[in-house]
């Protein structure tokens, strides 16, 4: 039987609601503020597919630095040119969806809440939050079967996405360190001996920046040509850093006086020695992990996995805005709203790092395991 629904949206209205939802998702997404189209972005956004003999794919291109010394004086340059080495990395894409469904007309009458507006806000927040979780798990080389507090997810939905397997690839040899009393040490905190992990100090921040530069992690060019790095840690990790005596002294004396000083403002980000330090709840930690699955040899040490990020630390296939669909059930008594997005994440790797030209390395991120 044909039905007429005067509340149904036109295609133009649906497009407007979809754009509104994606605006909410982008505004609430933490990782989105670090995304850009160019090679100078921490998260490089790929917004179009590249056609090839294998079909249309989301391709992230990494270009290695030149290795040769060129030609001196009037020596012949022709025939001695150096070929640029470019590495194409394909980002797998998939679709993630969610929906709300109203109980019925009477439930709607009893509520003053606008169903469309609430769905837009709640679904938009959900989408932004899931993008954040997957982005940080990908950069941390951890599977989508985990929550960012180390506990196991209630469902395996995220781990079935086509790009999920790329997240569960261990950090490469020169891109994983942990903090000990002796300083920055190679290897992950999960493989460290019991009792050696330490919390982050001001000295560690300075040494981590030097470690990134020594290992050719390309920083993000700022105004004046200076390179900066982003360092992400948990709120608890930031609290420990703010209690470090050297950190307190430097912020107190180098910062502005009065209530605008970061010690008093309670800011979520602070600049230290060319490193912008951010606290974020979805930086991975082990507080929710079962005993034996935490850090160090016995798996019983609480820790966090900080992320030291330069340019192109993460690739994101961002193919169009989210979409918005509405449907009605039970003779139009129960309206439902669904949203979805096609996207993908990948922590890029390449060969050609001047320190180890033949070794496959994570391109722009170092994992830093510390105690909590």
Write out the residue ranges for each language-model feature.
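N-terminal "assembly arms/tails" that initiate or stabilize quaternary assembly
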Residues: 1-93, 353, 358-372
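Glycine-rich, histidine-containing beta strand-loop boundary motifs that form or position
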Residues: 62, 104, 119
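Structural recognition of the beta-strand scaffold that forms the well-ordered cores
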Residues: 58-61, 101, 230-232
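Short, solvent-exposed loop/turn segments at the edges of secondary structure
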Residues: 55, 93-95, 226, 332
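Extended, low-charge hydrophobic alpha-helical regions
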Residues: 92-110
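Core alpha/beta structural scaffold of self-assembling particle/tube/pore-forming proteins
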Residues: 2-22, 109-372
């Amino acid at each position: 039987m044909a039905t007429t629904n005067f509340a149904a949206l036109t295609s133009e209205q649906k497009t407007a609601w979809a754009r509104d939802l994606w605006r909410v998702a982008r505004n609430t997404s933490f990782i989105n503020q670090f995304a850009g189209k160019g090679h100078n972005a921490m998260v490089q956004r790929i917004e179009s597919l590249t056609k090839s003999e294998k079909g249309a794919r989301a391709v992230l291109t990494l270009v290695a630095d030149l290795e040769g010394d060129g030609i001196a004086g009037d020596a012949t340059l022709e025939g001695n040119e150096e070929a640029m080495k470019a590495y194409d990395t394909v980002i797998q894409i998939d679709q993630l969806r969610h929906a709300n469904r109203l109980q019925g007309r009477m439930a709607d009458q009893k509520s003053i809440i606008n169903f469309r507006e609430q769905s837009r806000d709640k679904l938009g927040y959900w989408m932004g939050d899931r993008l954040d979780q997957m982005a940080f798990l990908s950069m941390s080389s951890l599977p989508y079967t985990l929550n960012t507090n180390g506990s196991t997810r209630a469902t395996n939905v995220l781990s079935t996405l086509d790009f999920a397997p790329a997240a569960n690839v261990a950090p490469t040899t020169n891109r994983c360190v942990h903090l000990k009393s002796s300083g920055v040490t190679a290897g992950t905190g999960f493989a460290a001996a019991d009792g050696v992990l330490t919390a982050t100090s001001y000295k560690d921040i300075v040494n981590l920046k030097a470690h990134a530069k020594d290992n050719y992690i390309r920083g993000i060019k700022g105004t004046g040509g200076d390179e900066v790095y982003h360092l992400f840690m948990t709120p608890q990790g930031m609290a420990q850093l703010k209690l470090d005596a050297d950190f307190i002294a430097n912020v107190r004396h180098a910062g502005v006086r009065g209530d605008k000083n970061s010690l008093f403002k309670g800011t979520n980000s602070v600049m230290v020695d060319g490193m912008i330090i951010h606290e974020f709840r979805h930086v991975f930690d082990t507080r929710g992990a079962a005993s034996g699955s935490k850090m160090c040899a016995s798996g019983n040490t609480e820790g966090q996995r900080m992320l030291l990020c330069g340019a192109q630390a993460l690739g994101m296939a961002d193919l169009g805005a989210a979409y918005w669909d509405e449907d009605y059930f039970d003779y139009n008594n129960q309206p439902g709203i669904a949203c979805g997005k096609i996207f993908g994440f990948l922590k890029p790797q390449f060969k050609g790092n001047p320190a180890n030209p033949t070794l496959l390395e994570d391109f722009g991120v170092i994992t830093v395991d510390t105690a909590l």
